[in-house]
Amino acid sequence: MDKRHDPSRRIIAPHGSQLSCKSWLTEAPMRMLMNNLHPDVAERPEDLVVYGGIGRAARDWDCYDKIIEVLKRLEDDETLMVQSGKPVGVFRTHADAPRVLIANSNLVPHWANWEHFNELDKQGLAMYGQMTAGSWIYIGTQGIVQGTYETFVAVAKQHFGGVAAGKWILTGGLGGMGGAQTLAGTMAGFSVLACEVDETRIDFRLRTRYVDKKATSLDEALAMINDANASGKPVSVGLLANAADVFAELVKRGITPDVVTDQTSAHDPLNGYLPQGWTMAQAADMRKTDEAAVVKAAKASMAVQVQAMLDLQAAGAATLDYGNNIRQMAFETGVKNAFDFPGFVPAYIRPLFCEGIGPFRWVALSGDPEDIYKTDAKVKELIPDNPHLHNWLDMARERIAFQGLPARICWVGLKDRARLAQAFNEMVKNGELSAPIVIGRDHLDSGSVASPNRETESMMDGSDAVSDWPLLNALLNTASGATWVSLHHGGGVGMGFSQHSGVVIVCDGTEAAAKRVGRVLWNDPATGVMRHADAGYEIAKNCAKEQGLDLPMLKD
């Protein structure tokens, strides 16, 4: 019997202002853990899988139940320790210490590979936390939408003079992360053709308004794209097909998309990528009997897909890796020039990271969408001179369906995060919001990740693989008084390829919270500016000087 599987479970976080725990500092992590497993949020909630292949919220259902039990009794001077999804200890700390400290899927580097991890996983000794799955701040696909939108806007600026109309994106994957591509693409003005082997995922994206149409053949999908481009109104199409098959077929037909990328779960060849010619049932059976054969077949198909991406790049498509490590998998399978197309961070996002700009997100613990709409208005009020941000907030309200507890994401940086958080805390204090807000972020941020094939690819000083930075980030956020802090390994790109940290803090309207958010939400993005200034980026150095950061080795 698999202790991680229970189809009878249906988890819905409490709404409103009534507490189940002893304070909002423990109610918040409880609600956010539960929200990660909401049926409209998680990919496979019955298996505790939130997104990203096997990214889980808790190690098994016994651990989940015990975490909830402990949070309900936890005092405001105690800290719960969670080791790979398992609650292992409660310790007396102090009121400004985190209420929860989390470490997920961390392995000593020599053993940091999927083979060793999968053995531990089967024995119930580890859990893959992805990034926000095991750190309890996943907000559904919205969590990656703006970052994807910003990337596609940058693609349009670099390659098409800022005009995306009449252009289309080819991609793969409509899971928790990949599902953002279709909506983000159309918001940026592109049509999008996304390949997905799991029809339930396409239907889920249709239901939550992330995909406009479904197609069951390539010809049908291309006709939809062509019609949209002719009309000038972008459309997103979920095509029920294997991405490797479709990408290679387009090369064969001589059809070149304007943009090519991919967000299949290629980071996990055993659980995340369906080999060409295989059914999902066949793959599920083979995972139980011959894991090595599954991995070999999946990586062979990834090699086919990456080769097609290279061919489409040669034919004129703007081609980019979107951080799922598919280039690495193809390289290991013989595609020696797999890294000839760039990752999205060095190509489009790094200048934002240099100013500490990244995926700032917040969630209304009340469950009331009006609380989010009021905070949207507050963001516009406090950042009046950023029409791009205002446009994003307007589009998000109009086009993004909330999943689980209402939430919002917007990319802001060092200059704005702390003051926005303090304003939100004041709104809770004054009764403008019906319950406290939690503020967090993706681990994909400027100072919180070391990932040489994604966020820290091609650092100008060669420090791509130095992982001191996310460790320092986690330590500083803990010292600064975050409500919960997490330190993970393997998110996004898989075992052995990344280390990263997460942070969440509660705005409960108290003066103590105002002080904590002021520290945490200044220091957290400041570590990103520090990291990039240390690597030699002039934008980061200038930002550090402008904001008065004390960086001892930064020369005037």
UniProtKB/Swiss-Prot annotation:
<keyword id="KW-0520">NAD</keyword>
<feature type="binding site">
    <location>
        <position position="322"/>
    </location>
    <ligand>
        <name>NAD(+)</name>
    </ligand>
</feature>
<dbReference type="InterPro" id="IPR035085">
    <property type="entry name" value="Urocanase_Rossmann-like"/>
</dbReference>
<dbReference type="InterPro" id="IPR055351">
    <property type="entry name" value="Urocanase"/>
</dbReference>
<feature type="binding site">
    <location>
        <position position="130"/>
    </location>
    <ligand>
        <name>NAD(+)</name>
    </ligand>
</feature>
<comment type="similarity">
    <text>Belongs to the urocanase family.</text>
</comment>
<feature type="binding site">
    <location>
        <begin position="242"/>
        <end position="243"/>
    </location>
    <ligand>
        <name>NAD(+)</name>
    </ligand>
</feature>
<comment type="pathway">
    <text>Amino-acid degradation; L-histidine degradation into L-glutamate; N-formimidoyl-L-glutamate from L-histidine: step 2/3.</text>
</comment>
<dbReference type="InterPro" id="IPR023637">
    <property type="entry name" value="Urocanase-like"/>
</dbReference>
<keyword id="KW-0369">Histidine metabolism</keyword>
<dbReference type="GO" id="GO:0019557">
    <property type="term" value="P:L-histidine catabolic process to glutamate and formate"/>
</dbReference>
<dbReference type="GO" id="GO:0016153">
    <property type="term" value="F:urocanate hydratase activity"/>
</dbReference>
<feature type="binding site">
    <location>
        <begin position="263"/>
        <end position="267"/>
    </location>
    <ligand>
        <name>NAD(+)</name>
    </ligand>
</feature>
<feature type="binding site">
    <location>
        <position position="492"/>
    </location>
    <ligand>
        <name>NAD(+)</name>
    </ligand>
</feature>
<keyword id="KW-0963">Cytoplasm</keyword>
<feature type="binding site">
    <location>
        <begin position="176"/>
        <end position="178"/>
    </location>
    <ligand>
        <name>NAD(+)</name>
    </ligand>
</feature>
<dbReference type="Pfam" id="PF01175">
    <property type="entry name" value="Urocanase"/>
</dbReference>
<feature type="active site">
    <location>
        <position position="410"/>
    </location>
</feature>
<feature type="binding site">
    <location>
        <begin position="273"/>
        <end position="274"/>
    </location>
    <ligand>
        <name>NAD(+)</name>
    </ligand>
</feature>
<feature type="binding site">
    <location>
        <begin position="52"/>
        <end position="53"/>
    </location>
    <ligand>
        <name>NAD(+)</name>
    </ligand>
</feature>
<dbReference type="Pfam" id="PF17392">
    <property type="entry name" value="Urocanase_C"/>
</dbReference>
<dbReference type="GO" id="GO:0005737">
    <property type="term" value="C:cytoplasm"/>
</dbReference>
<dbReference type="Pfam" id="PF17391">
    <property type="entry name" value="Urocanase_N"/>
</dbReference>
<protein>
    <recommendedName>
        <fullName>Urocanate hydratase</fullName>
        <ecNumber>4.2.1.49</ecNumber>
    </recommendedName>
</protein>
<dbReference type="InterPro" id="IPR038364">
    <property type="entry name" value="Urocanase_central_sf"/>
</dbReference>
<comment type="function">
    <text>Catalyzes the conversion of urocanate to 4-imidazolone-5-propionate.</text>
</comment>
<dbReference type="InterPro" id="IPR023636">
    <property type="entry name" value="Urocanase_CS"/>
</dbReference>
<dbReference type="InterPro" id="IPR036190">
    <property type="entry name" value="Urocanase_sf"/>
</dbReference>
<feature type="binding site">
    <location>
        <position position="201"/>
    </location>
    <ligand>
        <name>NAD(+)</name>
    </ligand>
</feature>
<dbReference type="InterPro" id="IPR035401">
    <property type="entry name" value="Urocanase_C"/>
</dbReference>
<feature type="binding site">
    <location>
        <position position="196"/>
    </location>
    <ligand>
        <name>NAD(+)</name>
    </ligand>
</feature>
<keyword id="KW-0456">Lyase</keyword>
<dbReference type="GO" id="GO:0019556">
    <property type="term" value="P:L-histidine catabolic process to glutamate and formamide"/>
</dbReference>
<dbReference type="InterPro" id="IPR035400">
    <property type="entry name" value="Urocanase_N"/>
</dbReference>
